[in-house]
Amino acid sequence: MRVALLSESPADEAALRLLVEAVLVESFAMVKPGLRARGWPNVAQVLPAILRHLHFNTDADGLVIVVDSDDSVVHTAEHEAPDYFHPQCRLCQLRGIFRRTQKKFPPLHGRDRVLRAVGIAVPAIEAWYLCGQDPQVTELAWMEGQARAQAPYTRRDLKWRVYGTDRPGLGFEIQRAMECARRHRDPRRLAADFPHGFGAMARDLRGWRPRDAARK
């Protein structure tokens, strides 16, 4: 399988590769996305160009994107209703960009389009890294805090818990990201504690398999 990854930093993408392999239960060949993104909203800004590059210039099977939710609206089951779109939900926004960009692409390289997998780390990818180690860090805890206007922790808190600092050097950040991601060879705990953000990505990825098998 040939897959491109897009996230907010090289450290995020290093961890994302391991998490995607855990969901797919197989390794994959990396395809360069053509452009890099650094933070939100840059991911959304470069996504159309990346989709065009992957469709016309590569034989990539799919593109996986993960961004932090920060303080935005968290994706929920209600957002999965047909034709539903929440303008403040980053997962809804990214899916919308996929639809608008790809709808006029002709079939190419043996596929109709590059497959989509989108995840949202609530409120930041460091929360995923702490899954199974800190039971207080969950998607539900964050959403309940949003409802009370009293966050149970901050993104800075999460960085301190993972890195021992809120300003890790890139090399150390990548090292810790990969160490944490390797703990999730079985991703079911992540899907249970982060059912909307991680769960959405996992469901997308599991839906890739039939087409990939047909191409072999």
Indicate residue ranges for each PLM-predicted region.
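Structural motif
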Residues: 41-48
